[in-house]
From Swiss-Prot:
GO terms for cellular component: extracellular region. Keywords: Amphibian defense peptide, Antibiotic, Antimicrobial, Disulfide bond, Secreted. It is found in: Secreted. Its main location: secreted. Disulfide bonds join C18-C24. Transmembrane segments: none annotated. This is Brevinin-1Ra. InterPro entries: Antimicrobial_frog_1. Pfam families: Antimicrobial_1. Antimicrobial peptide. Belongs to the frog skin active peptide (FSAP) family. Brevinin subfamily. Expressed by the skin glands. The lineage of its organism: Eukaryota, Metazoa, Chordata, Craniata, Vertebrata. GO terms for biological process: defense response to bacterium.
Amino acid sequence: VIPFVASVAAEMMQHVYCAASRRC
C-alpha cells in the first residue's frame, strides 16, 4: 500500500465533501 496515494485520496474525499456541503 502506498501512503502517498492514500493521503491524496483522503484529501480529495474531504475536498469533495467540503464542496458538497458548502461548509468550507
